[in-house]
Amino acid sequence: MSSFANLFGKSTKVDENIEQLFKNTRDGPVSKDELVKKQRTVIKIPKVTAPKQQTNENESTLNQSANESDEEEEEYNDESNEGDDSDDAEQTEPTSKNDDENENLEAQYFDKLLSEQNEEQDESKESSEAKSSKVAEERTKAKVATTVDLKEKELEKADRTVFVGNVPADVITSKIIAKNFKNLFKHYGKIDSIRYRSISFDEHLPRKVAFAKKNLHKSRDSVNAYIVYKEKPASIAAKELNATVFEDHHLRVDHVSHPAPKDNKRTIFVGNLDFEEKEETLWKYFNSKLDQDVESVRIIRDSKTNLGKGFALVQFKDTLSVNKALLLNDKPLETGTQKKGRKLRISRAKSNAKPSLMSPNHFDNQKKKFAAGKSQQKLNDNQKTKIGRAQSTLGKADRSTVGKAKRIILEGQRATKGEAIKGIKGSKKGKKVKKPRIRERSTKFKEERKTMNKV
C-alpha cells in the first residue's frame, strides 16, 4: 500500500487544491433570487398602421404581426410583475435613428409601387393621345406637291446659246462697240440676250456696284460673252465666226450644248507663261510662225481672280502644225519686235490625267456620290438623260440643284394695266390720278398776294 500511496501523493494536498477552487463566492452556486433580479431582454416591435390602398393579404400579415407583438407584451408584463417592487417601473429604452427610419418601410415600398404603376398608365395614355393627334394632323394636312427639277428650261436655253471668248473689254464701257458686236452676230438670226462674264474689276467692291462704275482692271483687256438666239439653227450657224478679228481681238466662238470636238493630236500645251499674259499675244505669235493655222487659244484662268495660271492650250487646224510648234520650245515669246524674258515650254497635249481614285475630289467619285443621292428617286430613262446633259452643259449653280425636288407653285391670272381690282382704290378705268399739290408754289403765291393787298 505504501508504494501505491506514494504514486498518487497525499490526499491532503488534493483536498487543498479543491478548496482553493471554491474559495471565491462568485464561483459558488447561484441562488434563485439572483436569477429573478436579472431582467429579460425584450425587443419592442412598434405597431404599423396599414395604408388604405393595401390588399387583403397585406392586412392579414399585419394583423398577425400585431397579435404576436401583443402576446409578447403580455408575457413581458407577467414576468415583470413576478419581480421585486423596485423593478415594477418599466425602463424606457432609447430608440435609434435606424428604427425611426425603418418604421414604415413596407408601407413606403407599396406606395412607391402604386405610384410607378399610375405614372406608367399616364404615360401610355399620353403617348396614345399624341399618336392619335399626329395621325389626325397627317390626314388633315395636304401633302406638298413636288416635282423633280430637270432644268428643262435651262437645257432648252443652252441649245440656243453660243460662247464667245477673247471679247474686247471695251464692249462694256463703249455703247458703239457693244452695238457693233451685237450686229456681228445678229447677221445669223434674232438675238434674245447677251451676257458678259469673267470681268475683272480694279476695286474690291460688290460686282453690281463695280459694274455700274465700270472700273475695269487695266491688265485684263478681254471678257467672255454668252449670246442667246431665239432659234437653235441660228446659234449653230454662228459657229462660223470662230477666229474672226473684232476690234483687234481674235474671237473664239463655240456652241454651249454642241461644242467642237477636242483633238489632242492637233493641240499643244504651252507653259511658263506670265500670269497676266493675254490670249491675243498667243494668237498673233503662233499665227506668224505657222501661217495663220491657229484654230483656238485658251488660257486657263482662276475663277476668282480671272488671272492666268501660267499655261494655255493652243489648237491648230492641221496636225503638221503641231510638229512645227514643237520646234519653238525653250524660245522666248515675241510680241512684235520685243522678246519676253520667259522661255516657252511647249509639248504635245495629253488626255486629261485623272487624279488618284482614292481622292474624294476625283471626277468618278463625285459622279458616284451624285448618283447615290439621286438613286433614291424613281426616275425613268428620259429623266436620267436630261440630268446627265444638265451636269455636263450647265453652270455650277444649276448643276447643284438639278435632280432635286422642287415645289409646284400655282399662279393665278396676272393683272393687266387698267383692270379693275376688288378691294383696291383708284383702279377703275378712265379715272385720273390726282397729282400732289406743290406747296412751295402756293405759299409763295399767298405771300405775294398779301404784299399786294398791303400796298
From Swiss-Prot:
GO cellular component, one term: nucleolus
GO biological process terms, semicolon-separated: maturation of LSU-rRNA from tricistronic rRNA transcript (SSU-rRNA, 5.8S rRNA, LSU-rRNA)
Compositionally biased intervals (Acidic residues): 68-91
All residue ranges annotated as the RRM domain in the record: 160-258, 266-351
SUPFAM superfamilies per UniProt: RNA-binding domain, RBD (SSF54928)
Function: Involved in pre-25S rRNA processing.
Name under which the protein is recorded: Nucleolar protein 12
Taxonomic path: Eukaryota, Fungi, Dikarya, Ascomycota, Saccharomycotina
